[in-house]
């Protein structure tokens, strides 16, 4: 899958799950299961419930995503 094919949306982390997985409530109301991208993991970026995040979704499975950015 090419980088151009991803769908970027913003949301809020509502729950931290085991294995660096998070339940994210998107701005459009949907909930997705998201994991932390490699760059955030390498730089030890902490993600807590309530944080604003940017999530990349695959067009093939819109229920799972990758967290690529953390706001305040």
UniProtKB/Swiss-Prot annotation:
Chief subcellular location: cytoplasm
Keyword terms of this UniProt record: Cytoplasm, Initiation factor, Protein biosynthesis, RNA-binding, rRNA-binding
Entry-linked PROSITE patterns: S1_IF1_TYPE
Molecular function as annotated in GO: ribosome binding; rRNA binding; translation initiation factor activity
SUPFAM superfamilies registered for this protein in UniProt: Nucleic acid-binding proteins
NCBIfam families assigned: infA (TIGR00008)
Function: One of the essential components for the initiation of protein synthesis. Stabilizes the binding of IF-2 and IF-3 on the 30S subunit to which N-formylmethionyl-tRNA(fMet) subsequently binds. Helps modulate mRNA selection, yielding the 30S pre-initiation complex (PIC). Upon addition of the 50S ribosomal subunit IF-1, IF-2 and IF-3 are released leaving the mature 70S translation initiation complex.
Subunit structure: Component of the 30S ribosomal translation pre-initiation complex which assembles on the 30S ribosome in the order IF-2 and IF-3, IF-1 and N-formylmethionyl-tRNA(fMet); mRNA recruitment can occur at any time during PIC assembly.
Protein's name in the database: Translation initiation factor IF-1
Annotated source species: Caldanaerobacter subterraneus subsp. tengcongensis (strain DSM 15242 / JCM 11007 / NBRC 100824 / MB4) (Thermoanaerobacter tengcongensis)
Gene, per the UniProt record: infA
